[in-house]
Amino acid sequence: MKTVLLVIKVFLLASMVLSCATSSNAFREIDHAVDQADFTAAVDAVVRGQRGHRGQRGSRAIYTERNAISLFMDKGLLEHYAGNYAASSEDLQNAERLIEEAYTKSITENFFSFIINDNTREYPGEDFENIYLNVFNALNYYNSGNTEGALVEIRKLSQTGGKLDMLARRYDYTDPETGASLNDIAQRETGIRDLPEIASVNFSNSALARYLGALFYQANGNIDSARIEFNQIELAYRTNRNIYRDSVPRAVEEARNVPAGLARLNIISFTGLSPIKQEQLIAHYLPFRHPILQVAFFKLPVLVKRPSVITRIEVAVEGAGSFRLELLEDMGAAIEETFSGRFSSIVQKTYIRTIIKYAIADITAMEMARQQGELAGLMIALTARTAMDISESADIRMSRYLPDKAYIGGINLDPGTYSVIINYYNGNNLISRDTYADVVVDNNGLNLLQSVNLR
């Protein structure tokens, strides 16, 4: 009896910790500002959502101490969209630092999370966040006039041993001595034979990162490195079919071969909002003796799409013509692909944790039924199951303001100054328009115009 009471107390304590979990409703103010493309107001709303901010009650804080990575990611992205590149760079660098530190956290904290719930530890960040923060920080550097700094960010992703290279291998780990996979190791350590398998991740090359790298190398006069990056775009399309389902955009080849005497105006546009995590209940049969404990409901984080209303983007350059932007990278698909490996790991960990909890409860309930009757056993089983269900919640923390898609296009022009209009359509209906006056197009450097529409 003392054992089950102790177990229940632990689970109820965990439920108190998790009761402050943030729901998507808490982000309404930020989401509204983003929908209105008022990114400065969105940043202000994020700041108000920090724990400890003046006037913000701790129990209502959106970004707690355990969710610092999401804070820096959200704030850094929104600062970028608002054109505050220095502030954005600082925030994204903080997010990157915390993600790196999360990999080296003590095994004690990880063990506690293993027994209770992922929400009991600091949010470690997702693989896709660790990748795309470098893309946007590269654009921060470029927009601040620092092309070399932009290339440093891109090389963090693309070089041998970089983030994309490591991601491709992380979930295909094998023990160098025994050749055991992650699944084999988990089964050996837990003794549970029917564990869900950890999926591999097929995202080892980013056309978006390669495209930006090629343009930055061109701007620095490093033609050979630019050639390699352009070639890597084609390789990314061939080897990552879950993400790149169409042919390489024509704009890639056009940017690669600009006629002598002309200057290239390149356009990159980010649209929509990437998928976000939501909690999903999944029922699963467990082979325990007490009927109350034979069905468990796993609470798992699943990605849910946020469809964009934008179906077409057209660019008009005054006196030079118009062209349509082409999809370069489905960032939402890349996010889903990179999350698949982590999701499998989460399912496996949740499964193990649930088995352990229910096994303790089943043993205690059956023993109580034997000693004091079926009603006593039923009460123990019901109480334990309720406590366990309360103690569980899916970890839905993540960055909410990554774009869903990246489009590119461009036009070869005589060097000069132009007016540029970017039109966003839903079918034949004009949704919004970005106008850029006095755009200087020079044949001695990179002419990259960036637009964002997250609707």
Model-derived regions: residue spans:
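Bacterial Sec signal peptide processing site at the extreme N-terminus
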Residues: 16-41, 50
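Residue-level signature for tetratricopeptide repeat
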Residues: 32, 71, 78-79, 140, ...
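Boundary/linker segments of alpha-helical solenoid repeat arrays
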Residues: 54-66, 99-110, 161-172, 234-252
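Extracytoplasmic/secretory-pathway proteins
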Residues: 157, 175-406
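C-terminal soluble interaction/assembly domains
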Residues: 366-455
